[in-house]
Regions:
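A generic structural signal for short beta-strands and their flanking turns/coil linkers
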Residues: 14, 20-22, 30, 40, ...
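HotDog/MaoC-like acyl-thioester-processing domains
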Residues: 1-13, 99-150
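Generic structural detector for well-ordered beta-strands
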Residues: 19, 23-25, 95, 145-147
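A solvent-exposed, acidic/Ser-Thr-rich amphipathic alpha-helical stretch
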Residues: 64-66
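Hydrophobic beta-strand-centered segment that forms part of the acyl-chain substrate-binding groove
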Residues: 54-58, 68-109
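Catalytic strand-loop segment that frames the active site of acyl-thioester-processing enzymes
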Residues: 1-61
Length: 150
C-alpha cells in the first residue's frame, strides 16, 4: 500500500498510477450475499449446477458486485494520512469487460486523472481498473469521482 502524507501531494500525480490493491478472492458466499442484498438472484450468479452448464462454465459475480468492491480495493491500494473522510461523488464511465467467475481473484489498479482543490479538500477523478488474475482483459474499468476532506 502506498501512503501519501498529504492530500496536496496528489496534485502533482495527475496522469500517474497512485496505487494497486491486494488480490481479493471472489467466492460463492460473497456472490450469494450480494444477491440477497440486491434481490438479483439470476441463476448465472447463484445456481452453481446450472451455471456450470451455462455460457461461462461457472457462476459469475454480478457486474455491480465487481463495481461495489472499489472501496475495499481503494483501501488496500493507497491512503492519504491527512484525509479525515471521503465521499463518493459519482462515476463518469463504467464498463464490465470480462466476467468474474467464482473462485477468481481481482485487484484494483488506480490512476489519478485529475485533482481539483475544494474548500477543505479536493475532488479526485480516478481511472479504476479492476484486473482479473490470469486475464489480459480487466473485469471492469470505471472512472470514479470522489471528494476527500482534510
Amino acid at each position: 500500500m502506498k501512503i501519501y502524507p498529504h492530500l496536496a501531494d496528489l496534485a502533482a500525480l495527475a496522469g500517474h498510477d497512485i496505487g494497486t490493491s491486494d488480490w481479493l478472492l471472489i467466492d460463492q458466499a460473497r456472490i450469494n450475499l450480494f444477491a440477497e442484498a440486491t434481490g438479483d438472484h439470476q441463476w448465472i450468479h447463484i445456481d452453481p449446477a446450472r451455471a456450470s452448464a451455462g455460457p461461462f462454465g461457472a457462476p459469475i459475480a454480478h457486474g455491480f458486485l465487481t463495481l461495489s468492491l472499489l472501496p475495499v480495493l481503494f483501501e488496500s491500494a493507497f491512503a492519504v494520512a491527512d484525509v479525515r473522510m471521503g465521499v463518493n461523488y459519482g462515476l463518469n464511465r463504467v464498463r464490465f469487460v470480462s466476467p468474474v467467475r467464482v473462485g477468481s481473484r481481482v485487484r484494483g489498479r488506480f490512476k489519478l486523472v485529475s485533482f481539483e482543490p475544494l474548500e477543505g479538500g479536493a475532488q479526485l477523478t480516478v481511472e479504476a481498473t479492476i484486473e482479473l488474475e490470469g486475464s489480459v482483459k480487466p473485469a471492469c474499468v470505471a472512472e470514479t469521482v470522489s471528494r476527500r476532506y482534510i
